[in-house]
Amino acid sequence: MTELKRTPLYEQHRRAGAKLIDFGGWEMPVQYAGVIEEHKAVRSKAGLFDVSHMGEVELKGKDSLAFLQYLLTNDVSRIQDNQIQYSPMCTSAGGVVDDLLVYRYSREHFLLVVNAANTDKDFAWMQAQAEGFEISLENRSGDFAQLALQGPWAEKILQKLTSMDLAQINYYWFKHGEVDGVLCLISRTGYTGEDGFEIYLPPEHAPRMWERILEVGGSEGVQPIGLGARDTLRFEARLPLYGNELGPDITPLEAGLGFFVKLEKDNFIGKEALSAQKEKGVPRKLVGLEMIERGIARSHYPLQKEGKEIGFITSGSFSPTLNKNIALGLIPPEYAQIGETLDVIIRGKAVKARIIPSLFYKRQG
């Protein structure tokens, strides 16, 4: 059995009584107080996440921008220094290798943040596409710890530890500066549907930073949050999860991410396949579902219409915010009308669900 990797915060999680699980080869906290309580804390106050398992790849060289324009579906030329962009990274068939964040330091220097379980695969994929480009790629994942402070009180809490004016960091922008005396990269990003920040710092400083944020945020009710609530939070906000809404056999267009696929851009990997799919119309569409009958629709459960299998669930859970069982499913567009009823097959039994708008939660303001 392969030994599980641990983040620099493993001892903090263990001491806090977190329930630890294997997540993509990492021993990570799935919950502390409980998923529902943690979920509600992030929606109403603030939560602190250990996301140090995420991968970071540094890209340098005079062809850096040209390489990213070829590698990714989004138009990286649109972002400025200190700005961040989300993009799928596709195969030539249009399937998704991964979805990632691009941090631009300069035209010749970027940081790419990828999903934990995909880090090695992504790095190998990038290297394989790099031929002919004057660039260097380095897997820097071991050099960064990453904390995410999310929720309506996130800015107020983090501001106590830095002289930087956090209100000046706009959504999907970042700055370098000191937090509690440690030089960090701070970005206004997150995976919860709430306002918040992601803090990149040297691993040796992560345990103290974790403890300090929980300490100074105590009066605002900040709580440590596990991966269980991270999943229900992202799911309510319709943020895709690789392996569920995205994968080698699901295109960004099918997943409803057409906004991040710039087909007018010059040649990029997957352009031909995605252009053809757009012209022809997507064969499948991601829809929101609410359970009419009792049951939770889990990932990969079949979806049927009048006894005929038409698709499958990508993600499903109880929604603490809406107080009902909801899901996302991938089905042919002809079945995708709002209000249409479908059957989810749960342990061999057909359980009724209704199609609803898939953005289950959007924060106010």
Swiss-Prot record:
SUPFAM superfamilies found in the cross-reference section: Aminomethyltransferase beta-barrel domain, Folate-binding domain
Alphabetized Gene3D superfamilies for the sequence: Aminomethyltransferase beta-barrel domains, Aminomethyltransferase fragment, Probable tRNA modification gtpase trme, domain 1
Reactions catalysed: N(6)-[(R)-S(8)-aminomethyldihydrolipoyl]-L-lysyl-[protein] + (6S)-5,6,7,8-tetrahydrofolate = N(6)-[(R)-dihydrolipoyl]-L-lysyl-[protein] + (6R)-5,10-methylene-5,6,7,8-tetrahydrofolate + NH4(+)
Pfam families attached to this UniProt entry: GCV_T, GCV_T_C
One GO process term, biological-process aspect: glycine decarboxylation via glycine cleavage system
Assembly and binders: The glycine cleavage system is composed of four proteins: P, T, L and H.
Family matches, as InterPro entries: GCS_T (IPR006223), GCS_T_bac (IPR022903), GCST_C (IPR013977), GCV_T_N (IPR006222), GcvT/YgfZ/DmdA (IPR028896), GcvT/YgfZ_C (IPR029043), TrmE/GcvT_dom1 (IPR027266)
Name of this protein: Aminomethyltransferase
Role description: The glycine cleavage system catalyzes the degradation of glycine.
Gene Ontology cellular component terms for the protein in this record: cytosol; glycine cleavage complex
Record flagged with keyword Amino-acid biosynthesis: no
Name of the gene encoding the protein in the UniProt record: gcvT
